[in-house]
Amino acid sequence: GLFPSLGSTTAGSLLSGLWLQDVLMLAVLACFLAARKTSWRMIGVRAPQGRHPYLGAVIGGILLYVLMTLLVQLINALLPNGLSAQNVQSYMQADDALWVKIFVVLTMGVFVPIAEELIFRGYLFNSLCRYLTPQMAMLFTAVIFGCAHMDAQRAIPLAVGGYLLNVIAVRYQSVFASAIAHGLWNAVMIVAYYSVL
């Protein structure tokens, strides 16, 4: 694997898979941008603009966590057998070494959100804006984001979260703002999950 020091643990497999997937997605994105002669800045890779953008991104991340928790609890209550564990949760349960937990939080709270924001709120959203109104592009991007996680039970909450991340990216004219919110959402979720294990 990419992280031989993790051994053959399921956490190591998860992290290797996530890093490989995201590195490949970013490589494909870089090729698309080069082929279209589009700069990274054109897809939102720039400092957040507007009033208090970093504070807004942090507040957005906290609100995302609260809203997603409520939506997941609602869905959990409506399903006869409740929600099944996410793959990430299953992997996190398999290895309880502190350094693995820290690495999972960093991976899910930093690397994955940056990659996903560049793909969804950066490239996809801006590409759809060529053919759709910004509101429709936000909606389509959110639905694709929800479906891309390959979790039918959580697709709606993830789409809602994706829409709110679009709002943050558009509001602050930067995928860095939405990456901060996304990273905080993921990190708080993982830390909260670890705290109840």
Where are the model-predicted features located?
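Hydrophobic core segments of transmembrane alpha-helices in multi-pass, intramembrane catalytic enzymes
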Residues: 21-25, 104-108, 158-165
